[in-house]
C-alpha cells in the first residue's frame, strides 16, 4: 500500500519540543537581513543563487532591491563559508508562491538555504560538505525530520528549477538527508496512479507536466514531462520508504 510519507514526517515535526532552541548556528557568520517575519521551521528548502558571486547574492538578500525584497536564512559560498542572514525563528522571504504536501505558505514553515551556484555548474565539494554539516545542525536543533529537505523547484515546479539538475541529491541521502531510491526497484502494482503518487509525495500536480519535470530533475538529473517505467518504479519505491542510509 502506498504510504503518504511527507504528511507523516511533517506531523512528527509539529509534535516535537522546541523550547530554548538556539536561533543562530554556531557554524555561520552572522550578517543580518531586515527582510523577515516570525515563525517556526518544519522543513528545509534548498536554493541556488543563480548569480555570479556570493557577495552579489548577499547584497540582494540583505537589501530592499527593486525586484522585490528577498532573503534566506543561510548562504553557503562555493568555498564552504556559511553566512546566516535571518534567525531560524524568523520567516525569511525565500520560497515565494508554491505548495508542498499540505503547506501553501512555505516561508512560514521552512528554513531557506541559498547555495552560491549559477544554476549550471557542478556544486563544489567544500560547499556540499558545509551544507551537510549545516543540515545536521538545523535538524538536530529544531527536530526537523532529516527527510524533510526539498528543492525550491519541488515546491514551485511551474516557475523554479533550482538548485538544478546537477545538485547531488544522492550524496545528501547517503548522509541521511532527503529521500532517495533503492538499487532494486519494485514493480508498481496494477492500477498504480503516478499523478496521485506524485501528489502523495508532496508535489502540486495541478500542472502535471511541471510536477514531472521537478521530479525527474531531482531523481533522474534531467527534465522530462512524462514518466517512463523507471521513473514510476522510483516513485513507487520512494513512497514506500526508498533507500535507507
Features from the language model and the residues they span:
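Active-site-adjacent loop/helix surface patches within enzyme catalytic domains
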Residues: 20-39, 43, 50-147
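Basic/polar, cationic surfaces and motifs that engage anionic cell-wall
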Residues: 18-23, 119, 123-245
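Bacterial N-terminal signal peptides
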Residues: 7-16
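Short, well-ordered secondary-structure micro-motifs within conserved domains or adaptor modules
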Residues: 44-47, 216
Amino acid at each position: 500500500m502506498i504510504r503518504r510519507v511527507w504528511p507523516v514526517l511533517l506531523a512528527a515535526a509539529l509534535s516535537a519540543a522546541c523550547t530554548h532552541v538556539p536561533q543562530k548556528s554556531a557554524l555561520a557568520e552572522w550578517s543580518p537581513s531586515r527582510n523577515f517575519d516570525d515563525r517556526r521551521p518544519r522543513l528545509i528548502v534548498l536554493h541556488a543563487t543563480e548569480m555570479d558571486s556570493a557577495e552579489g547574492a548577499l547584497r540582494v538578500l540583505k537589501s530592499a532591491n527593486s525586484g522585490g525584497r528577498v532573503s534566506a536564512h543561510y548562504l553557503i559560498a562555493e568555498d564552504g563559508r556559511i553566512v546566516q542572514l535571518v534567525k531560524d525563528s524568523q520567516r525569511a522571504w525565500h520560497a515565494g508562491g508554491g505548495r508542498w504536501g499540505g503547506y501553501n505558505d512555505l516561508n512560514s514553515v521552512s528554513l531557506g538555504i541559498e547555495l552560491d551556484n549559477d544554476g549550471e555548474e557542478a556544486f563544489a565539494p567544500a560547499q556540499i560538505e558545509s551544507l551537510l554539516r549545516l543540515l545536521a545542525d538545523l535538524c538536530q536543533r529544531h527536530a526537523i525530520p532529516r527527510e524533510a529537505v526539498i528543492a525550491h523547484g519541488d515546491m514551485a515546479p511551474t516557475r523554479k528549477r533550482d538548485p538544478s539538475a546537477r545538485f547531488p541529491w544522492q550524496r545528501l541521502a547517503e548522509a541521511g538527508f532527503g529521500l532517495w531510491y533503492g538499487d532494486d526497484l519494485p514493480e508498481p502494482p496494477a492500477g498504480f496512479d503516478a499523478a496521485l503518487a506524485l501528489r502523495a509525495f508532496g508535489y502540486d500536480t495541478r500542472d502535471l507536466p511541471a510536477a514531472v519535470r521537478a521530479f525527474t530533475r531531482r531523481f533522474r538529473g534531467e527534465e522530462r514531462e512524462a514518466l517512463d517505467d523507471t521513473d514510476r518504479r522510483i516513485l513507487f519505491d520512494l513512497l514506500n520508504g526508498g533507500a535507507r542510509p
